[in-house]
């Protein structure tokens, strides 16, 4: 489902419809509801994917050079480990942009670097392919993420909203 409101309704409102109608959520903040951050994370990833042309532009990639851009899932087998890439862009010039899309109420912590290193290590691609890590976030990052100089690009999505 690509419509953000419909996705939110099906995942959050519909399962709680009876409680909502009985007034059990009156006076409660949405952000305090169970699973709220997970739902918002999915919504944010969907928002990023719906604005993929802007992401490609910010990465300074010519849209005509893109041969693949979508989320990517690599199944675990005997020879390879599994991994899930939030958003991956492959160009005809043997470059893959491995994008980690992070939503958090707090600034993104330095642990994102080790998480990304592990994903890229697990990703099976030919040796000649360049893998460029990209962080797409909202609500900031801690200074140590910048200091690590790990990511080829860091996109603060709140600047686009």
What are these regions (language model features)?
Residues 2-161:
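A cross-kingdom feature that marks ATP-driven nucleic-acid transaction machinery
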């Amino acid at each position: 489902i690509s419509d953000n409101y419909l996705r939110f309704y099906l995942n959050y409102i519909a399962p709680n419809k009876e409680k909502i109608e009985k007034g059990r959520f009156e006076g409660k903040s949405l952000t305090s509801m169970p699973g709220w951050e997970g739902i918002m994370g999915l919504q944010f990833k969907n928002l990023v994917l719906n604005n993929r042309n802007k992401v490609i532009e910010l990465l300074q990639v010519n849209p005509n050079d893109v041969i693949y851009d979508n989320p990517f899932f690599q199944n675990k087998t005997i020879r390879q480990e599994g991994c899930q890439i939030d958003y991956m862009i492959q160009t005809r010039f043997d470059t893959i942009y491995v994008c980690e899309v992070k939503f958090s109420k707090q600034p993104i912590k330095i642990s994102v670097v080790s998480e990304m290193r592990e994903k890229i290590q697990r990703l099976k691609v030919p040796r000649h392919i360049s893998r460029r890590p990209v962080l797409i976030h909202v609500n900031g990052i801690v200074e140590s993420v910048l200091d690590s100089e790990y990511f080829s690009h860091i996109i603060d999505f709140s600047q686009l909203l």
